[in-house]
């Protein structure tokens, strides 16, 4: 087996232990790449904070607006990975260049609504009665970041879908790690005028992020096109309109799912804010901790997408079923261990964010530690649902999972959390139990759907 874990023939499906090893090998560089992206976001936040709360508020809100928009649109490009995996499994690698170039054109087209949305951030904020000065500064920030939209859709959206499917996930790893250093140097230099760079204040962070995103995209394109080992996957090929329709058909429900999940957490954060500064601070700490741990099952879900898709393409639904359920097991196992850490050492974790011995922090520390206990449960089902969603994408099954996610998050999760918070008197804890309930319902629906779909494929005459 190659480093990609995708070169076995359909006649020789792997054992369960080999499934686990290959999935972990594929997921590891993806997880580190995603953690590197989080590290860049943390760097931006810390350096913006050095300019004061106004700069931090404007830059942070502008960056969040940018990343929500491009992340949702990147969901459409997730279809590239399963299409490539299917083609490779079916020994139809001649289709891969067509998928790549069609995905490349799709990235360019998706950048258009991203640029439009980012250009409208100031009037949108004014429409929601945000302070005019804040709206103006956010508009200036996103006015720069809009030039990074295409780079992000290519360098993150397309490449993160394409490279793992051809066995080149490690390219993402090294480029992402390098991006941390480049981003930090450019951020500091452009914010404060260091290293001979112009002093741009808080807008320097937007310029630095834009440059880093484009450097990342160019580096990945160079590594992909410049290596003989992978060049045949991206040889000149004409994008195909029917293939464009196929990619959009698989990908748009994923984008909606990303949007539904993003709005759930956004609405929860806004609702926690009603409960006061202490509750909001505790919520942000717990959510940040959970977000770091989430990068691992997210990567496992991406690996499941590729591996399930490969074995479906190879005509072996039994191996595809095993690949999916082994990935689910890995995701649940990791998040269970992560949850155990949260239960055993909540105050030590909160101490990374706040001074535990400061009496002014006592209420926030207590609530944050309590939320981490809920997060221990929350994480397990969150990992299960994201891996299950990835496995279903490998089956090209995205529309029913989209409906399941919408129902689970907004039909169960938010209403339950709201009732527990304001009618049962649980406050922020109630909202977090609501999140856990919503994620648990989606996790069960995803796993059950994968079971039904693979059972049907196995039973079907071939």
Swiss-Prot record:
Which residues fall in a coiled-coil region? Answer: none
* Primary localisation category: membrane
Q: Which Pfam families match?
A: MatE (PF01554)
Q: Which UniProt keywords apply?
A: Antibiotic resistance, Antiport, Cell inner membrane, Cell membrane, Ion transport, Membrane, Sodium, Sodium transport, Transmembrane, Transmembrane helix, Transport
Which Gene Ontology molecular function entries are recorded, alphabetically? Answer: antiporter activity; xenobiotic transmembrane transporter activity
Gene Ontology CC terms: plasma membrane
> InterPro entries from the xrefs?
MATE_fam, MATE_MdtK, MdtK-like
Spell out where the chain crosses the membrane: 56-76, 99-119, 147-167, 172-192, 202-222, 247-267, 280-300, 325-345, 361-381, 402-422, 430-450
Question: What is the designated name of this protein?
Answer: Multidrug resistance protein NorM
Q: Which organism is it from?
A: Burkholderia vietnamiensis
Q: Encoded by which gene? A: norM
């Amino acid at each position: 087996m190659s480093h990609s874990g995708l070169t076995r023939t359909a006649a020789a499906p792997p054992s369960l232990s080999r499934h686990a090893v290959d999935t972990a090998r594929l997921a590891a560089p993806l997880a580190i790449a995603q953690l590197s992206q989080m590290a860049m976001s943390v760097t931006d936040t810390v350096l913006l904070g050095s300019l004061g709360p106004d700069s931090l508020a404007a830059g942070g809100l502008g960056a969040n607006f940018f990343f929500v928009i491009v992340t949702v649109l990147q969901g459409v490009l997730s279809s590239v990975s399963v299409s490539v995996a299917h083609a490779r499994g079916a020994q139809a690698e001649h289709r891969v260049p067509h998928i790549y170039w069609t995905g490349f054109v799709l990235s360019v087209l998706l950048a258009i609504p991203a640029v439009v949305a980012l250009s409208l951030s100031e009037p949108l904020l004014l429409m929601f009665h945000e302070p005019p000065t804040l709206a103006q500064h956010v508009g200036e920030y996103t006015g720069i970041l809009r030039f990074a939209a295409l780079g992000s859709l290519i360098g993150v959206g397309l490449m993160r879908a394409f490279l793992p499917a051809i066995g080149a996930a490690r390219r993402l790893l090294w480029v992402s790690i390098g991006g941390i250093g480049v981003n930090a140097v450019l951020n500091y230099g452009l914010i404060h005028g260091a290293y001979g760079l112009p002093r741009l204040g808080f807008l320097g962070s937007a310029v630095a992020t834009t440059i880093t995103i484009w450097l990342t995209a160019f580096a990945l394109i160079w590594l992909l096109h410049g290596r003989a080992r992978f060049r045949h996957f991206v040889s000149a090929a004409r994008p195909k309109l029917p293939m464009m329709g196929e990619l959009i058909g698989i990908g748009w429900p994923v984008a909606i799912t990303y949007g539904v999940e993003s709005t759930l957490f956004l609405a929860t954060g806004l609702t926690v804010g009603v409960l006061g500064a202490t509750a909001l601070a505790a919520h942000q700490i717990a959510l940040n901790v959970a977000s770091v741990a989430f990068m691992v099952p997210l990567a496992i879900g991406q690996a499941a997408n590729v591996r399930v898709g490969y074995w479906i393409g190879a005509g072996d639904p039994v191996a595809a079923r095993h690949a999916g359920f082994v990935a689910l097991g890995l995701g649940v196992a990791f998040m269970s261990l992560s949850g155990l850490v949260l239960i055993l050492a909540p105050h030590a974790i909160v101490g990374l964010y706040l001074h535990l011995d400061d009496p002014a922090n006592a209420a926030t520390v207590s609530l944050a530690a309590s939320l981490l206990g809920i997060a221990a449960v929350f994480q397990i089902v969150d990992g299960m649902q994201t891996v299950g969603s990835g496995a279903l994408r490998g089956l090209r099954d995205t529309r029913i999972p989209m409906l399941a996610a919408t129902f689970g998050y907004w039909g169960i999760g938010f209403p339950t959390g709201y009732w527990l918070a304001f009618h049962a008197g649980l406050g922020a804890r109630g909202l977090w139990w609501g999140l856990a309930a919503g994620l648990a319902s989606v996790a069960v629906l995803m796993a059950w759907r994968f079971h039904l779909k693979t059972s049907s494929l196995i039973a079907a005459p071939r």
